[in-house]
């Protein structure tokens, strides 16, 4: 069998993937058990929302103010395994909102801000390489 160089080329192209796979495995391990406040409407519809996200590329969730869209949907995404290949981006219109939303999600997950959940506004980046959900302003 002649050596065409394809095997070596394949080895080189896949060699860089192993660290990525290890990082994915590490990121999957850090997700704590996820709970949902029963009083929030989004929590009650979590299975439907989860199925829609899993089955469709774009999902629009509409609900009343205070229904849990902002804080519970990132947790649903984590439960679906999102955030392993890259961060879950979560935008908020104002800096204070971005910070307080990140704080709330981190609190509900029982983690420190900047670990699994972080935020970035202007010149402040409170996140790390382990951050799975990053809340940020859209500007």
Enumerate the predicted regions with their spans.
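Helicase-associated low-complexity/disordered flanking segments
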Residues: 1-58, 73-76, 80
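Conserved P-loop/Walker A NTP-binding site and adjacent catalytic elements of P-loop NTPases
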Residues: 19-21, 43, 52, 57-139
């Amino acid at each position: 069998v002649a050596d065409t160089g394809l095997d070596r080329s394949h080895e080189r192209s896949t060699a860089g993937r192993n660290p990525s796979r290890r990082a994915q495995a590490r990121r999957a391990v850090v997700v704590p058990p996820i709970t949902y406040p029963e009083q929030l409407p989004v929590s009650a519809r979590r299975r439907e929302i989860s199925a829609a996200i899993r089955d469709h590329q774009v999902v629009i969730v509409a609900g009343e103010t205070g229904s849990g869209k902002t804080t519970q949907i990132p947790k649903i995404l984590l439960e679906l395994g999102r955030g392993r290949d890259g961060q879950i981006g979560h935008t908020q219109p104002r800096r204070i909102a971005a910070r307080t939303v990140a704080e709330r999600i981190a609190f509900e997950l029982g983690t420190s801000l900047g670990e699994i959940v972080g935020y970035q506004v202007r010149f402040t980046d409170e996140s790390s390489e382990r951050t799975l959900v990053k809340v940020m302003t859209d500007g």
